[in-house]
């Protein structure tokens, strides 16, 4: 019996020792294998600069050409704008407009007469007159011509009108229709609908009487129910009842 007990005890001890050894060894991580040393990186070979600086000169020239081109484009753009503005602002005088009329007047002059061409200039039209004056010592024929030419200038374009904000803010006083609208709203007790705070304040300040009426609104109809008792006070004196007149005795007979 003793031998059996000792054998069993020895087996148990061996198993326990093996289990503890395997558990402790499992927690430990295997050591990484030694890494080989990194190979040296190849050195970057920088491009060797040429002895002459031709490349740099070419780049600079190219940049200069670009900037000059841009400046030319800008100048041309500005010049075009100036030309357009000058065309818009240019005012053609009547002396240029009536060149053909003056030549025609001079052509039609008969021998012994001198052409007199006069014109008046205004903002909207040019008025001109062609007359002929006899040269002293020459035969005079009656010849006179008068013409009026009106050059109508196109009317200037008016800028579009800004849309008017009806009944808004401080502009209320300026428009009569807004004032009418205010009075109507106050009369029906609707003084703040569709209006901002400034407008409501303006309404209260300018239309105090209307605002007071608006607070009450429409008078409510009396509800059906018992009438209130009359207030105590001095009773009126009873009216005298008229007595019936005595009938005459002869009437019975």
Curated annotation (Swiss-Prot):
Coiled coil: none annotated. It is found in: Secreted. Residues 225-243 have a biased composition (Pro residues). Keywords: Repeat, Secreted, Signal. Residues 26-51, 154-168, 244-253 have a biased composition (Basic and acidic residues). Residues 1-21 form the signal peptide. Its main location: secreted. Residues 153-166 are annotated as: 3 X 4 AA approximate tandem repeats of K-P-P-K. Residues 29-47 are annotated as: 3 X 6 AA approximate tandem repeats of K-P-K-D-A-P. Residues 222-249 are annotated as: 7 X 4 AA approximate tandem repeats of P-K-P-[GAV]. The keyword Secreted applies. Salivary gland. Residues 23-51, 140-168, 203-253 are annotated as: Disordered. GO terms for cellular component: extracellular region. Residues 206-217 have a biased composition (Basic residues). Sequence repeats lie at residues 29-34, 35-40, 41-47, 153-156, 158-161, 162-166, 222-225, 226-229, 230-233, 234-237, 238-241, 242-245, 246-249. Used by the larvae to construct a supramolecular structure, the larval tube. This is Salivary gland SP38-40.B protein.
């Amino acid at each position: 019996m003793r031998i059996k007990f000792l054998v069993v005890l020895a087996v148990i001890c061996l198993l326990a020792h093996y289990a503890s050894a395997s558990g402790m060894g499992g927690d430990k991580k295997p050591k990484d294998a030694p890494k080989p040393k990194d190979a040296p990186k190849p050195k970057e070979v920088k491009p060797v600069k040429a002895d002459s600086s031709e490349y740099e000169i070419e780049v600079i020239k190219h940049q200069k050409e670009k900037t000059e081109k841009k400046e030319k484009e800008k100048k041309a753009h500005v010049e075009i704008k100036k030309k357009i503005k000058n065309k818009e602002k240019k005012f053609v005088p009547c002396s240029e407009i009536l060149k053909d009329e003056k030549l025609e007047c001079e052509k039609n002059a008969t021998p012994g007469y001198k052409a007199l061409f006069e014109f008046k200039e205004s903002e909207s039209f040019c008025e001109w007159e062609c007359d002929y004056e006899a040269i002293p010592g020459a035969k005079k024929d009656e010849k006179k011509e008068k013409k009026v030419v009106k050059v109508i200038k196109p009317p200037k374009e008016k800028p579009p009108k800004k849309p008017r904000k009806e009944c808004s803010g401080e502009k209320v006083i300026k428009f009569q229709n807004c004032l009418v609208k205010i009075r109507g709203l106050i009369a029906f007790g609707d003084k703040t609908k569709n209006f901002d705070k400034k407008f409501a304040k303006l309404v209260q300040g300018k239309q105090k009487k209307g605002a007071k009426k608006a607070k009450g609104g429409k008078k409510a109809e009396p509800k059906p129910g018992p009438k209130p008792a009359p207030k105590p006070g001095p009773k009126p004196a009873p009216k005298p009842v008229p007595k019936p007149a005595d009938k005459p005795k002869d009437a019975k007979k």
